Amino acid sequence: MSIITNTPKHLQGKRILVTALDLEQREHRGIAVYSKALIRHLRRMGAEVWLLTQFKPITSDLRQLPKETQRIIYSSRTLNELVHGKTLPTSKLEQLIPFLTKFGKRYRQLRRSLKFFKTSFQLKELRSFRLSELSDNPNLRINRLDYLQDVEGIVSLDDVYEASQLTALKKQCKPVSIDLQGFDAFITCCPLNLKPRNIPVFIQTVHDLIALEYAPHNENMRQFTHRLQACLPAKRIHVSSSTCRKFHEHISVNSIGEALSSEDTVVQPPSLYLPSLHRNAGGQANDLPPSSHLLHDQRSKSKSKTSSLKPFRYLLFNSSVEARKNLLFLVKAFAQSGLGRDGIRLCVTGKLKSDSYSKSVREVVANEPGILLTGYVDEATKLDLYLNALALLSPSLVEGFGIPVLDAACLGLPALVSSCDAHREIHDLFDFSDYVLPISILESRDWSSAMQAITGLHNDLAHKQEEERMRRLRRYLRISAEIEARFEEQIAQLVLS
């Protein structure tokens, strides 16, 4: 790949449309984190970033209002759906006579089934607004929508992602076509069954093939295959060499014999978001003492609550709770280690579900008081947990890349990880082999021993908390800057070539 000269605005003047599917979900994990990073760096390179959402709020009640009033209400409702999720339409009769609700539901189900036949969107169906039109808008101060500070405007296309998913269920791969005239590039943040028209650059992001490799992932395999096949005509961002290799072996079957170069893989930036004061301080960053309620004030004379943690006296698991993340294996290994009896805790930030897997996890946790289930945490709390942990634990069966492990390695936080290919790739970056330790997940005793060893090795950190947090912060700023610079260079090359 040719090196772009070190100018600050590679994409100045480019209008780039980015998909918002994962930003529409209730929890911002994984791909949503990648989406935010992509938006931020496109903006930093001078691009005018627009967000494609499938939310198209109800406006039938606004027809008698002035156009400008309609516009601000439409904008407000769109942003509200980005915060809370899609609002289902209800008629006035349904509101007045609740009995009619069941007929409304049947009507909406019929409408949804018709999307199975929706194969094309015209330019006139797109509706958009610029965020600069919203003067002093309260929605733009909501933490969940912080990524909008790097977005020029919102493009609404009613249920475009749902239509593409339904179409991908068909026997043949037939991507949904969209007229995107007026934009310079269209970038998806995950594989989508879409085909843009009238646009010079189309880039799809491929994170993994897990839905095809691992049946318990519970995703329709034909549908996911068609989403991946829709990536073939596009330029592609593969988030790891492992994903790139698997894509070439199983999807891009005509190019198996081609050499896979480093151009095929783009290492995404780490996800921890530091306060602006620390981001700007660089190598002079000061300590960032914990502020989360999960890390109680050590100066307090009151006894520690079971819902609190002590800095550098816990191990961290920061992932969603699903079978491939192997949390059940981890909680059993922690229980076997006996660390809970020594005051060391296991902090699990993933939100448990109502399925049988989460039920099995709960049964182990019920008998192991050293394990703390926090549920989903916000970005500030996540940063606190990373800065004050003894180590990160990631025993995944398979990963597309492994952002939690990348975050840990950038901080210089020790990470005990499974030996899947994606983790090994992170292990081989920079000096990460000093911090990332791949361990087989065939025997839980191996993990119990590793947890005991890492705890004993870093037992002194509790006595030099400020020094250790500053070391991690300064290292993170230095390493992440290198990764971000390379990321921007590769994205700019894809857009401009």
PLM features: residue spans?
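Carbohydrate transferase catalytic cores enriched for Leloir-type hexosyltransferases
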Residues: 2-497
